A protein has these predicted regions:
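Catalytic and substrate-binding regions of extracellular carbohydrate-active enzymes
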Residues: 107-114, 122-347
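Active-site and substrate-binding clefts of carbohydrate-active enzymes
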Residues: 1-165, 174-176, 198
Length: 347
C-alpha cells in the first residue's frame, strides 16, 4: 500500500509513520512492514519470475488514461513555450558569438536573458502549461510571453547591429543550427541584379512583391556566410521549378494531387520513388471535434470524442500566391459554421 503526499512529491511525514507504527498495536489488524518502492519492485520481479500462474502484461505506453485534454488545452501557451525555448537558445548563441568576436566572453550579456529564462520556467509550472489554471493566469501569461520575446528580440537586434558588415549591398547569413544547411532568406530589394556568395558563385533567386528570395547554400553550422548583391540593368531570367495543372502540382521533389476540398489525395516522393499516402487515404484533412467532456473541461477529452467529428470541406478560396524557381505558395480558405480557416501551403 503506497501512502503519503503524492501530488507535489512530498511523500510521507513523521505523523504518518507514527500512525503506521500504532496500527501494529491494534488487535485484529494484519502486521504491516514498512519498505521502499525499490524493494517492493525487486520482490515483485522475483515473485513473477517464479510463479506458474498467468501474469497480465501491459502492452503499450504506460500513462494514466485521464486528463488527455492537457495535451492541447491553452494551445497559445504551449506554442509560445516552445517558440521561446528555441528563441532563447539562439539568443544565447548570439551573445556568445558576439563576446568571442569582441575578444572576451565577459562581454556576453546574460543578465537580461537570465531574467527571461526565469519567466519561461515560471510559465512551465505544472498547472500553467497544461492549460488547467484559472482564467486570470493566462491573462498574465500573455504579458509574460510578450516581455520574454522582447528581451530576446533586443539581443538579436544588438547582435545584428554589431556584426553586420559595413559594405553596401552585402548581407551576412547566420546559421545557429548545429548542422550545415541551405537557407531560403528574404531580402528587401526591388532593384534588378543578381546575388553571389563569397566565392563568386551566382545564387538562385526568386522575386517577390517587395522582396527577393535568395537561396544561401551550405551555410556552415554555428557559422555564417556572406552574400553580395550586384545591381545591373536586367537581372537573370527566372526559370519556374513548379508545374501546376489545376489541382495537380509537380515540384522538384514531389507530385501532389488535391481534391475539391483542399485535401491531398496523392503525395509522391520523387527522391525515394514512393507513395507517401496509403491507397485510399488523404492528407491535409481538417477536422473539428466537439469538446464537451463529462468532467473537467480544461483537463479531459473523453474516449468517445472521435464519434463527434466533422470534416471541414467547404473550401472557399484556392489561389497560387507565389510561384518561381525557389518557392510555390498556395493559399486556401475554408468556412465552418461561423469560423474561417486560412492556410498557406509552401513547397
Amino acid at each position: 500500500i503506497a501512502y503519503g503526499f503524492g501530488d507535489g512529491g512530498g511523500g510521507v511525514n513523521r505523523d504518518m509513520l507514527e500512525q503506521r507504527r500504532r496500527l501494529d498495536r491494534i488487535p485484529g489488524l494484519p502486521h504491516v512492514k514498512t519498505s521502499t518502492a525499490g524493494e517492493y519492485f525487486r520482490k515483485l520481479k522475483e515473485t513473477v519470475k517464479d510463479t506458474d500462474q498467468y501474469v497480465n502484461t501491459w502492452d503499450g505506453e504506460l500513462y494514466l488514461e485521464y486528463h488527455r485534454g492537457t495535451y492541447t488545452s491553452q494551445g497559445y501557451n504551449k506554442r509560445m513555450n516552445r517558440k521561446m525555448e528555441l528563441l532563447y537558445r539562439r539568443a544565447e548563441w548570439m551573445t556568445v558569438m558576439q563576446g568571442l568576436m569582441a575578444g572576451s566572453l565577459e562581454k556576453a550579456e546574460q543578465e537580461s536573458l537570465t531574467k527571461g529564462w526565469k519567466l519561461i520556467l515560471t510559465n512551465q509550472f505544472h498547472d500553467i502549461i497544461p492549460g488547467s489554471s484559472i482564467h486570470e493566469v493566462y491573462e498574465d501569461c500573455h504579458k509574460d510571453y510578450a516581455a520574454i520575446e522582447e528581451i530576446a528580440v533586443q539581443v538579436e537586434e544588438d547582435f545584428t547591429e554589431n556584426t553586420a558588415l559595413p559594405e553596401e549591398n552585402t548581407w551576412t547569413v547566420w546559421n545557429a543550427s548545429a548542422w550545415t544547411k541551405d537557407e531560403l532568406i528574404s531580402i528587401p530589394c526591388t532593384e534588378n541584379g543578381y546575388f553571389t556568395d563569397d566565392k563568386g558563385c551566382v545564387l538562385p533567386v526568386q522575386k517577390g512583391e517587395n522582396a527577393v528570395y535568395v537561396k544561401a547554400e551550405q551555410v556552415p553550422a554555428m557559422g555564417h556566410k556572406v552574400i553580395f548583391f550586384h545591381p545591373q540593368a536586367q537581372g537573370k531570367e527566372e526559370q519556374n521549378s513548379f508545374v501546376i495543372r489545376g489541382r495537380e502540382i509537380e515540384t522538384p521533389y514531389y507530385l501532389i494531387s488535391l481534391n475539391d476540398y483542399g485535401q491531398m489525395t496523392r503525395l509522391y516522393d520523387k527522391t525515394f520513388g514512393r507513395e507517401v499516402l496509403a491507397e485510399g487515404e488523404r492528407g491535409n484533412v481538417l477536422q473539428m471535434f466537439e469538446d464537451k467532456p463529462l468532467d473537467n473541461d480544461a483537463w479531459d477529452i473523453d474516449i468517445y470524442y472521435q464519434q463527434k467529428m466533422r470534416e471541414i470541406t467547404e473550401l472557399t478560396a484556392f489561389e497560387v500566391t507565389e510561384c518561381g524557381p525557389l518557392k510555390l505558395t498556395i493559399h486556401m480558405e475554408w468556412k465552418y459554421m461561423r469560423s474561417f480557416i486560412s492556410q498557406d501551403m509552401s513547397l
